[in-house]
Every structure is written in C-alpha cells, then in structure tokens.
C-alpha cells in the first residue's frame, strides 16, 4: 500500500481531522497519531503544526503533493493543507511512515 492509498483508507475507514486550523487545535490537546502536511502549506502554519506536534510527540509527514493534490487523495473537492489521523481505521499508514 502506498502512502496516498494509506491516507485515503484512513479517511474512509478511520477518524481523520481535515484542515490546518482543526489539526492545530487537536495537537494542542495532544490528540492524534500522525500529521500529514501538504508540500505547499504556508510557512507559518507549518511551523505551528511542527511545534505543537513536537510538544505532543506526534510524528509529522510532509506529503509530496500540493494542498490540491492532498485534497484529491482524501477524496475531497477542496484543498487540504494538513490533516491529523486520530484513528487509522483499516489503513497501515502509521507503519508506512513510522
């Protein structure tokens, strides 16, 4: 299973938070297992996500694609700058990037 497929399976079968702001809010609470960021996420959001993820000891993966491509991988008709996987469901994404 490749990374894109792992993300899609997690979105379809698990519990995933989409969006930079909601991801940061959950990171502040220490919730989540993996953060996935788009390659073109704004630098200020990237720094915030990396900071709060480090405090919560949650790994961060930077997706090769843009936010448009990450949204498409998630099966959404909008851009996704970042997402937080709380429960991967049937996906093996945590093993792939961890």
Curated annotation (Swiss-Prot):
A Gene Ontology molecular function term of the record: structural constituent of ribosome
Keyword NADP: no
Disulphide linkage map: none
GO term, biological process aspect, one: translation
Top-level taxonomic group: Archaea
Iron-sulfur as UniProt keyword: no
Keywords from the named record: Ribonucleoprotein, Ribosomal protein
GO cellular component terms listed in the entry, alphabetical order: cytosolic large ribosomal subunit
InterPro entries from the UniProt entry: Ribosomal_eL30, Ribosomal_eL30-like, Ribosomal_eL30-like_sf, Ribosomal_eL30_CS, Ribosomal_eL8/eL30/eS12/Gad45
Family, similarity comment: Belongs to the eukaryotic ribosomal protein eL30 family.
UniProt-recorded name of the protein: Large ribosomal subunit protein eL30
Organism annotation: Methanothermobacter thermautotrophicus (strain ATCC 29096 / DSM 1053 / JCM 10044 / NBRC 100330 / Delta H) (Methanobacterium thermoautotrophicum)
Lineage start: Archaea, Methanobacteriati, Methanobacteriota, Methanomada group, Methanobacteria
Gene that encodes the chain: rpl30e
């Amino acid at each position: 299973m490749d990374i894109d497929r792992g993300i899609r399976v997690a979105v379809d079968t698990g519990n995933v938070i989409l969006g930079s702001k909601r991801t940061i809010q959950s990171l502040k609470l220490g919730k989540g297992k993996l953060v996935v960021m788009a390659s073109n996420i704004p630098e200020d959001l990237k720094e915030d996500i990396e900071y709060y993820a480090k405090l919560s000891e949650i790994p961060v993966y930077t997706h090769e694609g843009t936010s448009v491509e990450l949204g498409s991988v998630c099966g959404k008709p909008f851009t996704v700058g970042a997402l937080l996987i709380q429960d991967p469901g049937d996906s093996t994404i945590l093993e792939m990037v961890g």
